[in-house]
Amino acid sequence: MCIFDTIFLVIIMDKITIFLIRHSEQLKINTLLNNSENSQIANEKIILSVEGEKKAEALSKIKELSNLNSIWSSNYVRALATAKYIAERNNLSIQISTDLNERKIGNLDSLSKLRDKFTHTFTTEQLLDENLKNKDGENRFEVNRRMTSFINKLLAEYTGSKIAIVSHGASIKFLLMNWCSLNENFELFYKNKVLKIDSPSVIKLEFNKNSLLNLSQIY
């Protein structure tokens, strides 16, 4: 084996691909809970809609989500319900981390008062101000810190692997701010390409050790 073959082999072995997946379409429900703890529990238990189940199953069939080494999910029901189809097709067990949980919104009464002062949605306002925080909730900085810490653990432990992680809209956007910018419409973009974090969607992150090589939307 020549030196160039050796270098190429090392690069391949160090390469890690992470598929960052937003859960599928959730069931639309109304809640009258204003207590921060109760509303958080209710949010964690929201299931997928009938259409969301169909979309999650269709998502699992895309070619790039085959031959995975590991699949991770938040502990929210809708994330696990999305992950189950991918896990089944790859014959994997779902591993759970609360680091992948959605941004905690906090007290709904307090949020309602905050929204009266907003020009944009709460998530957009947080994208513009990493320290903006509702009572009993999380700001962008806090969510980014736990999401980034989780990604760094994967990069350290899963060299040469393909990993899927199922998370949530705000948390994914806050993580992507590590590499992306906002355009005039407050949309995330990377290398002039706009990213649509829909339910569901897949962002492919390719790393060599801790360095991002490429970021692209594949679904």
Give the ranges of each region predicted by the language model.
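Generic beta-sheet signal
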Residues: 17-18, 161-169
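Conserved histidine-centered catalytic loops in small-molecule metabolism enzymes
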Residues: 66-99, 119-126, 203-219
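Domain-level recognition of soluble alpha/beta enzyme cores
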Residues: 182-211
